[in-house]
Curated annotation (Swiss-Prot):
The modification Phosphoserine is found at residue 102. This is Phosphoglucosamine mutase. The keyword Phosphoprotein applies. It comes from Shewanella baltica (strain OS155 / ATCC BAA-1091). Belongs to the phosphohexose mutase family. Keywords: Isomerase, Magnesium, Metal-binding, Phosphoprotein. GO terms for molecular function: magnesium ion binding; phosphoglucosamine mutase activity; phosphomannomutase activity. NCBIfam families: glmM, PRK10887.1. It catalyses: alpha-D-glucosamine 1-phosphate = D-glucosamine 6-phosphate.
Length: 445
């Protein structure tokens, strides 16, 4: 396949005003995408965004470009990424566009597309769009220009969709939940969803100002929600990221429940109800404790490369339904086409209600093994992973760890770093093993 120039694994992303993230490129991208998407279908595109101040600028530019190509545009305003995927399906739109840089700081932004079925845009379509980007922008004739409208009830539609994933015979009455919206796209949705299901909700990170998204709050910064759960004597906490596609949780003791533990809860619940199809897909970074806990239940486990795109690919290849990353991207293909933090939280709460159990009880049988990650910078074009010294150090550590440990060495995709990850039963031993391999990598650099 031809190498992509603009699109990465999750659309286009970067610092606002530099590189590819400029209003000029957004305008041209809208036009190029419109040219490709207008060849068939409804000629209708939905645009949603998170709460970054630059979202308004990019929304206007994309809107103009799509209209210039003859496509009708429907604006949602600030809405979670999975809401764009859902409404793209229900409106039978040709595509959905999300303006977001997910968990990144406010000065970054990004643009990604969903296809008409709510899944990530096909690689070949992205290549077609890139080919159109190389051409001069030519506006359609005036009578063919696209029209722009706003979906006034997008929030209500998505709230009802989220609630529809919770069993009708149960409520959340009696639960006190802290919900952290990361000052992002879920700020006006997530608290309402859990309140309407009966919970007492304490909302934090729900006052976006355009520049505070993901700032010391949300799924990538768990300190605030852990403190709040303890201070408020809450039953649990739910932390979302800036665009609402990932989740982390907190139990009543203030302990973080990560994506691996959430996958374990969902797999156990599905198996107990006889609806688990196949097994669970994690990634190379998933904790060995998840693998061992699923083995004990005879639930198959497979690892993909890091990234929810690769988790999805492996789920489709194996025809399984549940997968995700320890960072909190959770996919359940019986409940959506992309990662959805709110829905994942609802499914965990449903498991709690069905089993009349606390979050602590649902995770008690899964032992998270100590995991140490060391980043080693290297210079030059050579590959330290091919060094005999590094290979020998890895073999020595793997031999000493046995079946209760794991070593993973991989290159960073964005920096000249080798990531050394070691897991095992004893934290001090794991740390020593990781440093042993890291020293070998340094000497080979």
């Amino acid at each position: 396949m031809k190498e992509r120039k603009f699109f990465g694994t999750d659309g286009i992303r970067g610092k606002v005003g530099s590189g590819q993230m400029t209003p000029e490129l957004a305008l041209k991208l809208g036009w190029a995408a419109g040219r490709v998407l207008s060849r068939s279908g409804t000629k209708k595109v939905i645009i949603g965004k998170d709460t970054r101040i630059s979202g308004y600028m990019f929304e206007s530019a994309l809107e103009a470009g799509l209209s210039a190509a003859g496509l009708n545009v429907m604006l949602m305003g600030p809405m979670p990424t999975p809401a764009v995927a859902y409404l793209t399906r229900t409106f039978r739109a040709e595509a959905g566009v999300v303006i977001s840089a997910s968990h990144n700081p406010y000065y970054d932004n990004g643009i990604k597309f969903f296809s008409t079925d709510g899944s990530k845009l096909d690689d070949n379509l992205e290549l077609e769009i890139e080919a159109e980007l190389e051409k001069p922008l030519v506006c359609v004739e005036s009578h063919l220009l696209g029209k722009v409208s706003r979906i006034e009830d997008a929030r209500g539609r998505y709230i009802e969709y989220c609630k529809g994933n919770f069993p009708a015979e149960h409520t959340l009455t009696g639960l006190k939940i802290v919900v952290d919206c990361a000052h992002g796209a879920t700020y006006h949705i997530a608290p309402a969803v859990f309140r309407e299901l009966g919970a007492e909700v304490i909302a934090i990170g729900d006052k976006p100002n355009g520049m505070n998204i993901n700032d010391k709050v949300g799924a990538t910064s768990m300190g605030k929600i852990c403190e709040t759960v303890i201070a408020e004597s809450a039953d649990l906490g739910i932390a979302l990221d800036g665009d609402g596609d990932r989740i982390m949780m907190v139990n009543s003791k203030g302990e973080v429940i990560d994506g691996d533990q959430i996958l374990y809860i969902l797999a156990c619940d599905a198996k107990s109800r006889g609806v688990l199809r196949g097994g669970v897909v994690g990634t190379l970074m998933s904790n060995l404790g998840l693998d061992l806990a699923l083995q004990a239940l005879d639930i198959p486990f497979a690892r993909s490369k890091v990234g929810d795109r690769y988790v999805m690919e492996l789920l489709k290849e194996l025809d399984w339904r549940i997968g995700g990353e320890n960072s909190g991207h959770i996919l359940n293909l019986d409940h959506g086409t992309t990662g959805d933090g709110i829905v994942a939280g609802i499914l965990v709460l449903a498991a709690m209600r069905r089993q009349n159990a606390t979050l602590e009880e649902l995770t008690s049988a899964m032992e998270m093994l100590p995991q140490v990650l060391v980043n080693v910078r290297f210079e030059g074009e050579h590959d330290p992973l091919k060094s005999d010294k590094v290979k020998a150090a890895q073999a020595q550590v793997e031999s000493e760890l046995g079946v209760r440990g794991r070593v993973l060495l991989r290159k960073s995709g964005t920096e000249p770093l080798i990531r050394v990850m070691v897991e095992g039963d004893d934290h001090s031993a794991v740390l020593a093993h990781a440093n042993l391999i890291a020293d070998a990598v340094k000497s080979a650099s």
